[in-house]
Amino acid sequence: MAREATRIRRRERKNITSGIVHVNSSFNNTMVTITDAQGNTISWSSSGVMNFKGSRKSTPYAAQMAAEDAAKKAKEHGLQTVEVRVRGPGSGRESALRALQAAGLTVTAINDTTPIPHNGCRPPKRRRV
């Protein structure tokens, strides 16, 4: 019996004009996820996906490239205006935001949703280099 040919699922074009950009910037990586108002993912990218490995993933340039890639994918779905939610202490926060504006998306609001503990978990010990 012949095997059935595997079908390549083609992503359908969603017509979404406004969305939310979640920029998660940690000390090691920067992830950019673009969702609609309900939280369904339209596109995403990260520094690691853009072929940055190791300590280069945490640079502002890697965050800029990841934001440009996610914005380019989202614009194919008709995205024009976004609200930005930045989370985390990483170095790629501002450069990712600038890259989104340079990619042609209109930023309507910027929120910092970094979680701040009210004396929760013990932080990692200080590095001695």
From Swiss-Prot:
Keywords for this protein: Ribonucleoprotein, Ribosomal protein, RNA-binding, rRNA-binding
Ribonucleoprotein keyword on record: yes
A GO MF term: rRNA binding
Keyword Zinc-finger: no
GO biological process: translation
A cellular component annotation (GO) from this entry: ribonucleoprotein complex
Pfam short name (any one): Ribosomal_S11
Lineage: superkingdom: Bacteria
NCBIfam families associated with the record: PRK05309.1 (NF003698), uS11_bact (TIGR03632)
Family: Belongs to the universal ribosomal protein uS11 family.
Subunit structure: Part of the 30S ribosomal subunit. Interacts with proteins S7 and S18. Binds to IF-3.
Function: Located on the platform of the 30S subunit, it bridges several disparate RNA helices of the 16S rRNA. Forms part of the Shine-Dalgarno cleft in the 70S ribosome.
Protein name: Small ribosomal subunit protein uS11
Organism, as annotated: Hyphomonas neptunium (strain ATCC 15444)
Gene that encodes it: rpsK
